[in-house]
Amino acid sequence: MGRTIRRRRSNSSLSEAISVSLGINQDSSVNKMHRASVSAMSPPLCRSYMSGFFTGGNSPMINNLSDSKLPISNKQHPKVIHGSENLHRQTAQLSNEFCSSSVEENSPTIKDYMDIIGNGDRKDDQSMRTIEENIDEEYSDEYSRLLLSPASSNVDDDRNRGLQNSSLPELEDGYAGGYQSLRPSHNLRFRPRNLWHMCTSFPSKFAHYLPAAVLGLLLNILDALSYGMIIFPITEPVFSHLGPTGISMFYISTIISQAVYSGGWSSFPSGIGSEMIEITPFYHTMALAIKEALAGNDDEIITTTIFCYVISSMLTGVVFYALGKLRLGKIVGFFPRHILIGCIGGVGYFLIITGIEVTTRVAKFEYSWPFFSGLFTDYDTLAKWLLPVLLTVVLIGTQRYFKNSLVLPSFYILTLVLFHFIVAIIPTLSLDALRQAGWIFPIANSDSKWYDHYRLFNVHKVHWSLVLQQIPTMMALTFFGILHVPINVPALAMSLQMDKYDVDRELIAHGYSNFFSGLLGSVQNYLVYTNSVLFIRAGADSPFAGFLLIALTICIMIIGPVIISFIPICIVGSLIFLLGYELLVEALVDTWNKLNRFEYLTVVIIVFTMGIFDFVLGIIVGILIACFSFLVDSTKLQTINGEYNGNVARSTVYRDYVQTKFLDGIGEQIYVLKLQNLLFFGTIISIEEKIERLLQISNKDATKRRIKYLILDFKNINADNIDYSAAEGFNRIKRFTETKRIKLIISSIKERDRIYNAFNNVGLLNDVELFADLNSALEWCENEFLFQYKQLRKKAKERLEEGKQNNVVSAVIAATKNKKIDTIGNGLNRGSNGDTARNLMSLPTNTPRNYQILSVAQNVFVNDEQAVKNFKKEYKDDEPVLPILLFALKQYRPDIISEVQKVREKEIKFWAQLCPYFTRRRLASQSHLLHADNIFFLVETGMLKATYELPQGTLYEIFSNGTCFGKIIAPGNAMPREQKLTIETETDSVLWVIDSSSLNKLKEDNLALYVEVALMVMCIKDTRFKELLGYTLVSA
């Protein structure tokens, strides 16, 4: 099965693009092997009377554009998306300065570095480092399978050639009812091995398939009499003599389609092809329009009309063939089925009206009281339409009682015999008298032949201007015709238990049959579901049966015109009424409680619009209703796939204890909205309303969300396209967030995306941060908060130094006055005056967000960071790795900073035993750390990236300084090859490492410590696993 790899939001075929815009193809992170399949258990739509059925480093405090200024696009200097490598360097520098115990006066601040990074991101793309992207790849589904298809329409060329050059289909028992079904083998064309075999096998095959062929012939005859007869509007005087011509054109179309299907161009060599009944209303529309334009010129009317018929057939064939060759078989399946059902009901309504016109011989059905009263008060007229109605009622009742495919042909054969028997035994009745009274079709001319209609093809009498005027009707006819193949073909395959078929191949076959039918002066045709099922179940399991049916049909066609003069009009009327009844039941009765109210109302509107006004108008109304329905339904799409604050949605950066504590406290000021589905004028309103409700910030109401960074993630947007209204909607969202002093961030967007270009064109990207993925956006937001905390800490240190100087001056003055003072600074250094320490930090604006940041920063500074600095000073003369080790283990071993001295000293003494086993390493940027699955290390400075390569995809995390990580695999155990861990330095780094040999030595020297290290590694990995799993679930 020909699968093709495609990149997300890449250019694809037309049918795939539509599949994406409707949501059929989903993201590969959800399901790479997803195949859209639609059930085919509902009945086919066809005649059914036979069976009754980012810029970098900028702090968020940026001067906003005034509301009076219109946003303008910046095509010369487009907004640059933040690069992941620059972002990781920023995080590394921030962590290095963050963990230092003091800030030197002349040292560059982290903000200077962030500005450098930002300026670097603004440079031209050629000077930037290549942005490392993770592009989702997914298999494009081989085929949407439309209704039930288990096989792809996008099969490869070799398979196509295999299907085109196959042998006789194999026979396989069906699952129900003992029926036999067809399963195509290697060759579908009928090719006898040799002439001798053909000659000897012909008699036996003829006898074997003759009953099935006779049944198929009866079906063709009934179809010819029911709607072949009314190809032309025979109730109009100018067309009244063209009933036999319509039948001949019907037979020609049937023979050509049967030859194409049985000749090996179709997967159903025993299927029955026949004229499309749905074309009749369109033909009548064209014929009547031409008659009105050429009143009084009968020959020119007929010639122009018949040319319109054959041109429409050729046009239909070309469209069928093009759809099949372009592999667009599934595209027609996107048309709403209830619209098609309404069109089918419209055909049924038309047939009921036509049945009344044919039986009563009225020129045109009128919607007036005199006309309706005449149908009941004129006894002759009443009898002519009531009798076929009664025949139809009797037949419907008989079919419900007897479930046999022969009921229909047997009923009408018996009716025909009974009619002539009654005429024979009643002396006052005669065929001639009945013909004059309108009960039997008039006698055809004695020299009338089946090919007489070819005499009507006179190019000199064609009014080509009128032909051009009928092109809209021809297009509507073609559009309506192509909707049946993707419905009837899967339905027939299901009935025959076929597992392998190709809708595109069937479209090509229909293209041949319709084009050649028009070329030979006939009308449209298609594969008839009901007749094909009856034909195959009667024993037609070989193309031979199809060719035998062709021969019998040719015989009847040659005799044709003579037979018509002996057929009672009531039988033809009954057939028309039956077909109209079946289609109306299928449209209006069978869909009750299956369609919702809006869909059912749509069906009713289409039915009566087609029946009362015009078929083309009905299709236009149906398409408009379908578009309106799609618009209404699209506005109801759930555009928010998920919403998370920063406490839940965290980046995969592994940060030290102090940074983690601070981010835990202010995480709710980061808010993520994951968008999904389509972005257009119908869905942007719901997004605006959601954000407006979300950003209702109040100084008094603590229940309102305190959001500083709003991230809109575009990962699950189904189509890389957005209209102007939606782009302007995001501009309104941006202006609204600016009034609330909230930074708008967009993630999962790339510079090559059309959405990026649309946003740039409307000026949305000014003062908006852009990131290629959600992880980078979260990392940037966390860095901004950590920078703000560092600034607060720097101010606290400056105030602390000022306090110490003031205390010295106060001490000198007090000494001269013999007074004693208690310095505040000593109290602070001992951490005994927490309240004063808190007062060292402040923010200029007292808002709920700033108050929260200040409160959390004060708590972290007093309770955690001061404690960490104290033990760093206490153990600075010991092993240089010890303070780093204790700082890294603090979040996993709280006893390291326990207030109980004995507990703290015992814990520190225990872990101090590990220091001799560490080795200090300096690694340049982009260096690999070899671990052999046994390692424990501390990050003193720098930044590392750990990449996990799994069968399901690749995931990475960043290790900042002040953290520890390890991996220990017991001897004899091995990790699966497909689960690979790669550790690489993102910046120049300094590590303290216990490698595999040192771990083995530790195990021999101090088993208890080795076990604790192993348990520590397990604890670290468990914590990191939960963090990574959480991010994976959030970003899905």
UniProtKB/Swiss-Prot annotation:
Residues annotated with Phosphothreonine modification: T130, T847
Positions of modified residues (Phosphoserine): S42, S127, S140, S144, S149, S152, S153, S842
One term under GO cellular component: plasma membrane
Subcellular location field: Vacuole membrane
Matching Gene3D superfamilies: Jelly Rolls (2.60.120.10), STAS domain (3.30.750.24)
Domain STAS: 660-781
Pfam families: STAS, Sulfate_transp
Chain ranges on the Cytoplasmic side, renumbered to this chain: 235-236, 291-300, 360-375, 427-473, 537-546, 590-604, 686-1036
Disruption phenotype: Decreases cellular arginine uptake. Sensitive to canavanine; the effect is suppressed by simultaneous knockout of YPQ2.
Superkingdom: Eukaryota
Gene Ontology terms describing biological process: basic amino acid transmembrane import into vacuole
Keywords: Amino-acid transport, Membrane, Phosphoprotein, Transmembrane, Transmembrane helix, Transport, Vacuole
One GO MF term attached to the UniProt entry: arginine binding
Bilayer topology: Multi-pass membrane protein
Bilayer-crossing regions: 214-234, 237-257, 270-290, 301-321, 339-359, 376-396, 406-426, 474-494, 516-536, 547-567, 569-589, 605-625, 665-685
Primary location group: membrane
Residue numbers on the Vacuolar membrane side: 1-213, 258-269, 322-338, 397-405, 495-515, 568, 626-664
Additional free-text comment from the UniProt record: Present with 1420 molecules/cell in log phase SD medium.
Free-text function comment from the UniProt entry: Amino acid transporter involved in vacuolar uptake of basic amino acids for storage during nitrogen replete condititions. May function as an amino acid/proton antiporter.
PANTHER family: AFR304WP, SULFATE TRANSPORTER YBAR-RELATED
Name under which the protein is recorded: Vacuolar basic amino acid transporter VSB1
Organism: Saccharomyces cerevisiae (strain ATCC 204508 / S288c) (Baker's yeast)
Protein's gene: VSB1
